[in-house]
């Protein structure tokens, strides 16, 4: 095998590996839970990220009073980000794929802090402050 062919084959293998990792990450099921509203806070249990045998990086919280769900990412026991899952481009509900949220309507992509990674959206997602209190997460909706 010549050097040029070797480099080409290695590049293809790297791209394939990267693609497959993103595919498998996207196949992981999202955990969806119901939240409750109390005193202008969306409340979920702090242990919502844990299942019997697995740990989730994020949970999707639905609540009937909210038009869109909220995606809550856990970075540590005290650091969370809560993002309104409404695309800032034209208002479609976003889908979560690992560390990114994607708009099925026009392809906008946001990272797990709500920042635009790929347009057409040019405004970051609405985020909510999260505090930990008595084994609960309080997501301020104010």
Predicted feature residues:
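N-terminal pre-ligand scaffold of iron-sulfur
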Residues: 27-88, 93-97, 124-142
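N-terminal secretory signal peptides and thylakoid transit peptides that target proteins
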Residues: 1-25, 29-33
């Amino acid at each position: 095998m010549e050097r040029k062919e070797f480099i080409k084959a290695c590049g293809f293998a790297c791209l394939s590996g990267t693609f497959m990792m993103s595919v498998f990450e996207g196949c992981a099921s999202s955990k969806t839970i119901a939240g409750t509203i109390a005193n202008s806070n969306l409340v979920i249990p702090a242990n919502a990220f844990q299942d019997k045998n697995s740990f989730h990086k994020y949970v999707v919280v639905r609540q009937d009073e909210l038009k869109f769900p909220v995606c809550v990412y856990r970075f540590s026991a005290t650091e969370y980000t809560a993002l309104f899952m409404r695309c800032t481009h034209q208002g479609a509900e976003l889908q979560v794929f690992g560390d990114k949220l994607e708009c099925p309507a026009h392809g906008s992509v946001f990272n797990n802090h709500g920042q635009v990674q790929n347009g057409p959206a040019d405004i970051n997602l609405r985020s909510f402050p999260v505090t930990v209190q008595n084994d609960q997460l309080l997501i301020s909706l104010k």
